[in-house]
Amino acid sequence: MDIAIIGSGMAGLAAARILKDAGHTITIFEALPGRGMDSHSIEFDGGIIDAPLRVMNPHLWKNTLSLAAHLGIKTFPVRTYMSCSWLFEDRTETWLTTSRSRIGNFPIINNRKGIQQYGWRLVKGMLQLKTAIHQFFKSKNQDITLAEFINQNDIEEVFWHGVVMPVLYTICTCNPKTIGDWPAKNLLEFLRHLTDGDMLLRMKGGTPAFVDSLIKGIDIHSGSAIKKVELQGEKVLVENEKGDQ
């Protein structure tokens, strides 16, 4: 069967690979130049910077990591350090840097300003968040948004807005209003593993290596948006602005 897939993000590429391996003929259409999933990855100093950040908790990224293993993509553990510069709207100076402990992989404040000016508030916020998450997963009312969760819990503002939310913005790549409307459960599960010190994984070669394996042997028409999706009898015509079908 000839199958068209619109979009080459994670969902589109995974579907394309699975259908290709099942014997179908696949064509991918992508509006952006190149491939959607790794279109913002940057080569720098002999390495690759993935944007958005592609670090995966093995408990939460089981399907992605299973697909990577199936394709022969190897992973390696990483310690995620932080540098926080967003706290007040009128200032963007770095106010906090962290590393990780050798035992337990827990975050450690390692700059003087972070310790002297905000240390207690950050420790307090961490304890408040861990307590709130623990209570959330013990409760029966887990069908709430992230905004509702934060409104129901007293968590130190500097910690929540200066540390936690920038991490979520980086992972989810969306604005505050959108992320506030997300179901809290999945995000809190992520934060629980993060604050517990779970080791995260990266793919060897970064996202581009993963994308290369996903699209191997598959035609992709990129750099042109879809202009027509039309039912023609028992088939569907897909055409982009360049006229590719």
What are these regions (language model features)?
Residues 2-28:
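N-terminal Rossmann-like FAD-binding beta1-loop-alpha1 element of flavoenzymes
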Residues 20-44:
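Glycine-rich FAD pyrophosphate-binding loop
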Residues 25, 74, 220:
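Residue-level detector of anion-binding/catalytic polar loops
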Residues 41-65:
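N-terminal glycine-rich dinucleotide-binding loop that anchors FAD/FMN and/or NAD(P) in oxidoreductases
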Residues 58, 62-180, 193:
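Mobile amphipathic helical/loop "lid" adjacent to a hydrophobic cofactor/ligand pocket
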Residues 187-235, 240:
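Helical element adjacent to the flavin cofactor pocket in flavoenzyme catalytic cores
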Residues 241-245:
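Core beta-strand elements of the Rossmann-like FAD/NAD(P) dinucleotide-binding domain
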